[in-house]
Amino acid sequence: MDVSLIEKRLLSHPGATKALHESWGWMVYWVGGKQFACEFIAAPDAKPPYAGRHLLSLKCDPDRIRELRAEFPDAVLPGYYSDGRTWISVDVDQAGMPGGPSEELALDLCDMSYRLVFSKLTKRMQREIAETS
């Protein structure tokens, strides 16, 4: 899947920003000071099944995580370096390919991640973001 499509979708949300986490080489996406996504290539020596994969980590509903893991066991993994109960890592190279999630689904998961994180911001922060967008 073309990463520019992912970036465009992630940054289309009100108040969304991105910043490179230089020491890790990860692109991290934020809203209201909270991370809602990150895109990166896992180190070649990372533990399996993450090693060397191009991943997109997203916040996700726990029930939806179980469904996605059952449907795409090799393409949707427990969140890398995050709580696997509430985060997933999608193999970007498998999105839109046979056996992997569709590009549309991957983009919908980006939207869900934003909504989940935005909903946990204070009401004041939500208003400020809405007013400046």
Language-model regions, residue ranges each:
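Charge-dense, helix-prone N-terminal extensions
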Residues: M1-S133
